[in-house]
Amino acid sequence: MADRIGKPVSQRQLRVGEMIRQSLGMIFARNEAKVPNLETNTITVTEVKMSQDLKIAKAYVLPLGGKDSELVIKKLKECSFLIRKALSKKIIMKYLPKILFAKDDSFEYAEKIENLIKQTNK
């Protein structure tokens, strides 16, 4: 796996990304961030990609059922400081990364590819 400029992702980036993904999953499952007007126990964190300097984490999330994903992403972005505060209690790092949230489209993409394969096999 390589990032946008072609440099390979380091083991440290992968390890820290996975640690943040697991911690975010626990935070959402237990509603530790206290995000208002959001059912956080239905959010799945599918992947976290770290920048090379480990100061930015891009978390790909998907609400259960995939509905209202734009609203969920908007609420998460608005309350990212609460989530980061809850994350700081779980992970000890010199610099806790800034968390950016994005919708995970990989399941929709995989379904689209499957449908194309089924159409060609007919």
Curated annotation (Swiss-Prot):
<dbReference type="InterPro" id="IPR023799">
    <property type="entry name" value="RbfA_dom_sf"/>
</dbReference>
<dbReference type="Pfam" id="PF02033">
    <property type="entry name" value="RBFA"/>
</dbReference>
<protein>
    <recommendedName>
        <fullName>Ribosome-binding factor A</fullName>
    </recommendedName>
</protein>
<dbReference type="GO" id="GO:0043024">
    <property type="term" value="F:ribosomal small subunit binding"/>
</dbReference>
<dbReference type="InterPro" id="IPR000238">
    <property type="entry name" value="RbfA"/>
</dbReference>
<comment type="subunit">
    <text>Monomer. Binds 30S ribosomal subunits, but not 50S ribosomal subunits or 70S ribosomes.</text>
</comment>
<dbReference type="GO" id="GO:0030490">
    <property type="term" value="P:maturation of SSU-rRNA"/>
</dbReference>
<keyword id="KW-0963">Cytoplasm</keyword>
<keyword id="KW-0690">Ribosome biogenesis</keyword>
<dbReference type="GO" id="GO:0005829">
    <property type="term" value="C:cytosol"/>
</dbReference>
<comment type="function">
    <text>One of several proteins that assist in the late maturation steps of the functional core of the 30S ribosomal subunit. Associates with free 30S ribosomal subunits (but not with 30S subunits that are part of 70S ribosomes or polysomes). Required for efficient processing of 16S rRNA. May interact with the 5'-terminal helix region of 16S rRNA.</text>
</comment>
<dbReference type="InterPro" id="IPR015946">
    <property type="entry name" value="KH_dom-like_a/b"/>
</dbReference>
<comment type="similarity">
    <text>Belongs to the RbfA family.</text>
</comment>
